[in-house]
Every structure is written in C-alpha cells, then in structure tokens.
C-alpha cells in the first residue's frame, strides 16, 4: 500500500470583529441605525484607525462620488429622518422616566399584620425579581413578585418596612430613581360592619 501524505488543513482563526459601544452593530453598519452621530463619536474616541478608514475625507468622498445626486439627497434625508426618530425616542424615554413614580404602599392584612407593596421599578430599568430577592435578604422577610389585578408586576414584602425600603432604594438605586419619584402610601382595609 502506498502511503498518502496527509496535509493537515491550516487552523482556522476566528476573525476579530469590533462592535460599536452605542448601537452594538459592527461600525460599518452604524450608518443604518438611528444613532449614527453618537456611533461616529464613539468610534473616534475608541478606535481611531477604524474611524480614519470609515469616516476620513477620502473615504467619504470616494463613497459619495459613486452615488448619483438623487441617491445622495435621498440618503441624506433618510439619515436625518432616522436621527430625528432616535432623538425623539430618547427624549420620550427620558420624559417617561422623569414622570414615573415608584410607589411604596403599606397594606394592612390582618389586625396588626402588614405587607409592603412596591410598584413602578421596571420603568427605571430595574428587574423586579432581582430587587425582590435583594429585599428579602436585606430585611430577612419573605418577598415575591406578583401581578396586581391591574396586570402590573409588583413586589410584595412581608412586614411594615416601607420607610426602610425607601431609604434602601435611594441608597442602592439613587442614580436611577430620584427621591422625588418615590412616594409612600398607606392603604388600610375597610372594616366591614356585620
């Protein structure tokens, strides 16, 4: 039998791809997102050589010279439209966050038993399950995430810890939630006369 020389194939190396820190796309595709200007600034600060390759005067003029005048105008309009949409969405989110209230409600269960119900954390970018777990550890009580009759997720903590929860939220999440957006509410069950 003849020996066949086996050539081992060259090892395949994974290509290192840079992803934008703003829109999480490769920088070549940032122009198709709504945050092109921010992406361009990020690229300039973090990857200067790639910025020069994509956004230098020569690169831009060579790309534009290949396009017809009508296509250039349309591209400029589309870019402006996308940028305006992204800015409007950002402003809307900021406005919603500023207006959103975190409500800490003390609810009477039985005669001297209370629970604390917290709603509105998810608007500020906090995960209810994680916060509920942290609250349970912090105050050594039972805490859970439940859906209210209105369909909104809320955190229920056993015991009257509303003041402590407010202080704890401000201490841990003061950057996300301003103090003016946290309100304490006391809710008593109505006595039924029988």
Curated annotation (Swiss-Prot):
SUPFAM superfamilies, sorted: eIF1-like (SSF55159)
GO molecular function, one term: translation initiation factor activity
Gene Ontology BP terms: formation of translation preinitiation complex; nuclear-transcribed mRNA catabolic process, nonsense-mediated decay; ribosome disassembly; translation reinitiation
Lineage: superkingdom: Eukaryota
Keyword terms, alphabetized: Cytoplasm, Ribonucleoprotein, Ribosomal protein
Residues covered by the SUI1 domain: 102-173
Main localization category: cytoplasm
Subcellular location: Cytoplasm
CDD domains on file: DENR_C
GO cellular component, one term: ribonucleoprotein complex
Record note on quaternary structure: Interacts with the 40S ribosomal subunit.
Family to which this protein belongs: Belongs to the DENR family.
Record comment regarding domains: The SUI1 domain may be involved in RNA binding.
Protein name listed in UniProt: Translation machinery-associated protein 22
Protein source organism: Aspergillus fumigatus (strain ATCC MYA-4609 / CBS 101355 / FGSC A1100 / Af293) (Neosartorya fumigata)
Gene coding for it: tma22
